[in-house]
Amino acid sequence: GYQKVMPAKDVLNLVEGVLTYSFEEAMLGRSLKDFPAMMCIRYGKSCLPIILRYLDQEHAYQFILADFATLEDWRLILEWLSALARQLGNEIHDNLGTSYDADSIFSFDYENYLLKNLQNLEQDPDLHQYQLQGFAHPVILDRELLRKILDSAQPLEEFSQVVKKVQYSSAFFSQVRFYRQNETGGIIGSYSLTEDTDTVLPRVPFVPAEFVEKVNMDEIIDWKVNLVEITGNPDMPESYKPVAAVNLEALLSALDSSEFELLDANQIEIKKLSKERLLQLAQV
C-alpha cells in the first residue's frame, strides 16, 4: 500500500552523524519529496557526498554514490540503505537490477567494484588527469599516482587516505582569479599565498570549469602568485598587504622540500611561511 514519504530529517537520522550541506536545518522537517536532491555526508568520515532524493513516479528513495567513493563512503551508504529498508520493510535495488534486503545489502562487493574502477582508470590510454569532486575539495588523480596506489600493500585504504587527506586539510585552498593586462591584452591567472597560512596551490595551473566559457587557455600569458604579508591584527582586513606577484612555477621551484607536501597529482600544500621567508620568495 501507499506509504507517506518520510521527512528529510527522519531519513538523515536513520544513521548516526549524517547531515546535508545542501539545505538549512530548519527546512528538513519537510517531506523528502519537496527537495530536488540532497548532498549528504558523515562529517569526519565521508569524502564524496551521497546524493539522496525521492523519485515520485517510482515511489522510491534514491541514493547515488560516485564510482570513486572511498571505503568509508561505501560503508556509510550500505549502513544507510539497510536502515531505510528495515524502516520501510522494502527491498533495495541497485542500478543493475539486483535486489537486496536489509541484511544481504552488506554482501555487496564494493571493494572489488572500487578496485576495478581504479584499475580501469589507470589503464585508460586517454588519461591525463582525472578530477574527483569531494564534498569539500576536488582531488586530482593521474597515472603515476594511481600506479603508486595500486602497487601499495592495501590499495583501497591508500586511495581512501589520499582522498580523505584533501577533504579534511585545514589549509586555505587558493582560488584562481583572472584579469586582462592592459598593455598586452593577455590574461593573467592569479593565486595568493599569505604569510603564516597553510596554503594549497596547483603544480600545473588550469582554468576551472566555471571560467571555461570566459577564459581561453591560449590567452593566458602568465600564472602569478600574490604574496601577502600581515602587518598588524590578523583579524583586520587592512592588515593584509600585497608584497609582490611572482611567477607560480618560479615560486614552487624556490621552495625547500620541507616547506611543502604533495596532496594528490596536482595540489601542493605549502606549510606556513614566516614573513622573512615570504620576503625572500618575493625576489624569485
Model regions: which residues?
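Short, extreme N-terminal segment that most often corresponds to the first beta-strand
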Residues: 1-38, 129-150, 280-284
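Short, intrinsically disordered low-complexity segments
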Residues: 7-72, 226, 233, 237
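Short, highly charged C-terminal tails/helix-capping segments
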Residues: 94-114
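Intrinsic-disorder/low-complexity loop/linker signature
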Residues: 45, 184-185, 267
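Acidic, low-complexity cytosolic segments
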Residues: 73-98
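Aromatic/basic-lined ligand-recognition segments
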Residues: 107-228
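A generic structural motif
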Residues: 25-32, 92-101
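Extended, charged low-complexity segments
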Residues: 215-284
